[in-house]
Amino acid sequence: MIICSTLIPVSAYADNYYISGIDISEHNESVDLSSLKAQGYSFVMIRLGYFNHLDNKFYENVQNAVNSGMNFGVYLYSYAFNSSEAQTEAEFAISTLSTLSAQAKALMTYPVAYDIEDNSISSKL
């Protein structure tokens, strides 16, 4: 298993419009989102967790996004091998996101993404 502890750039393109952001999780050191926003980063994708386990820095990372005024989305690393496990993951995500403050929900303008990297899962899609 490879664990990346650096910030992962994320970009989005549409109709000659370009925005850039980062992907963060518990594997990153503290991230100064205010500084990154000043450098031109528009958004951050925050790892919610994996399967039904919360990322240890999820709430801290969300609060940092709120404090910096940076828009964000979240992603869940999937370990689901069947529809029942996928439902467990979805219910976990919904339950966790329902606890966010109104201020955090207002800044969550990017999607809830499903991160599927395991070949034994993605090959069955």
Question: Would you name each region that the model predicts?
Answer:
Residues I3-I19:
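Sec-dependent signal peptide cleavage junction
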Residues D15-L125:
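Substrate-binding cleft of extracellular glycoside hydrolase catalytic domains
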